[in-house]
């Protein structure tokens, strides 16, 4: 029930599933496998898959191995790839233009890192009028406990909890497990 007019379509938004972003991420292999499963499902159902790739000189320098999308995933040449430099995938990128061109008003979000780019992108989408479903077992983050953060499994669980109950007028949020994702409507 997006607030965006004439935007009836859904897209799978794959955020920052890059070597450097998931190298030490919680439950990395399972999460990447779940993302791959959803990419395959979206392609079979002719749902747009939109890739987002973070670039910064400190952690993910453009062109480096750390910057590359993980080898288990391969964007199709016809699938949009949006390069970003900030946590919110919409900030100073062409993502809004890409989604508008595809008639997308609902996003199914997967990727990394939960407590950074996933949260920022979810909120960025929601305030821009998108419906946003977070796939609860297809996002991950690294361990930042040495800086006072909760363990990664708790960060993920907390994000799933609060996104399940996120509300705003005219928009739908929520979570779904990989096996329960329905690209045809709210999960």
How does the language model describe each region?
Residues 1-11, 37-45, 60-187:
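Active-site-adjacent betaalpha module
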Residues 13-15, 48-54, 135:
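Short beta-strand segments at enzyme active-site cores
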Residues 18-23:
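Short acidic, Gly/Ser-rich segments with clustered Asp/Glu that frequently serve as metal-coordination loops
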Residues 25-41:
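…and closely analogous acidic/polar surface helices at protein-protein or active-site interfaces
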Residues 25-30, 59-60, 149:
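Short glycine-enriched, charge-decorated loop/helix-capping segments at active-site entrances
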Residues 54-55, 112:
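Short, well-ordered beta-to-alpha junction loops that form the rim of enzyme active sites
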């Amino acid at each position: 029930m997006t607030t965006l007019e004439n935007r009836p379509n859904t897209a799978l938004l794959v955020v920052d599933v890059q070597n450097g972003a998931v190298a030490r991420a919680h439950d990395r292999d399972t999460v990447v496998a779940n993302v791959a499963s959803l990419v395959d499902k979206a392609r079979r159902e002719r749902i747009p898959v939109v890739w987002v790739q973070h670039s910064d000189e400190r952690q993910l320098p453009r062109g480096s191995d750390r910057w590359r999308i993980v080898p288990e995933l391969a964007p199709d040449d016809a699938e949009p790839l949006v390069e970003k430099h900030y946590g919110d995938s919409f900030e100073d990128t062409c993502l809004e233009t890409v989604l508008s061109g595809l008639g997308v008003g609902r996003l199914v979000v997967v990727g990394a890192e939960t407590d950074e780019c996933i949260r920022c992108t979810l909120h960025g989408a929601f305030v821009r009028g998108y419906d946003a479903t977070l796939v609860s077992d297809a996002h991950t983050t690294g361990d930042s406990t040495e800086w006072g953060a909760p363990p990664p499994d708790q960060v993920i669980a907390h994000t799933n909890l609060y996104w399940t109950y996120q509300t705003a007028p005219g928009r739908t949020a929520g979570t779904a497990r990989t096996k329960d994702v329905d690209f045809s409507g709210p999960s």
